[in-house]
Design a protein with these regions (language model features):
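Signature of dsDNA virion morphogenesis modules
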Residues: 1-183
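Enriched but not universal
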Residues: 189-209
Length: 209
């Protein structure tokens, strides 16, 4: 399931809801990706820009609990076709999903539906790789990273602790991604320093003349 792409994970406390009706059975809905929402990653703030999902690979996306790749997926979206047990829609606000849960035959699905209904689980998370980014306020101690394009969404999870990044898969997969983002930030800061150096050189030459 893991790829050679540098995958990142974002855990967010956006609402996830449990619903039930005679036509669709038991399902949960939620919005794992929200455009223009500022998230404190630690070394920087991060914003997923509007339109970042326009060209994203959503061909095969699983739905899990706490990114546990050792468990059977509770749902899956294949090319987002009508027969998929997870439906994904991208709109002006980001991404919304609808997950049909087989509560009769899958104990984990039944437990998740109950936990969401009770409010014990309220957050969603997604694993993704970045295709485009930009930075602002790179000369400050807490810059802002804009994710302008998401290359692929690999999976979406209902998460127990939406405000933290503590699962084992994050420890394995997030380190390289964070290192890459930090390298990108340092590159932007180096460019800024070079611009300032050239400006200073021009000022000195002007004063001499």
């Amino acid at each position: 399931m893991m790829t050679d792409q540098k995958m990142e994970i974002r855990n967010l406390d956006f609402e996830i809801r449990a619903e039930q009706n005679e036509q669709h059975g038991n399902y949960i809905t939620g919005r794992p990706i929200v455009y223009d929402a500022r998230t404190d990653i630690g070394p920087w703030d991060e914003i997923i820009d509007r339109g970042a999902l326009d060209n994203t690979d959503l061909k095969d996306v699983r739905f899990l609990i706490n990114h546990n790749i050792d468990m059977i997926p509770l749902a899956r979206s294949r090319n987002n076709n009508a027969n998929s047990t997870m439906q994904m829609s991208v709109d002006e606000g980001g991404m919304e999903i609808r997950v049909d849960l087989d509560v009769e035959n899958n104990a984990d699905a039944k437990s998740l539906y109950s936990a969401v209904s009770r409010g014990d689980i309220s957050g969603m998370s997604f694993m993704f790789s970045v295709d485009g980014e930009s930075w602002e306020d790179v000369d400050t101690e807490h810059p802002t990273r804009h994710v302008t394009s998401i290359r692929r969404v690999l999976e979406v999870s209902a998460v127990t602790f939406p405000a933290y990044s503590q699962t084992s898969i994050q420890v394995r997969g997030l380190a390289d991604a964070l290192d890459s983002a930090k390298a990108s930030l340092e590159s932007e800061r180096a460019k800024l320093r070079e611009i300032e150096r050239k400006k200073k050189k021009i000022r000195i030459m002007t004063e001499v003349l």
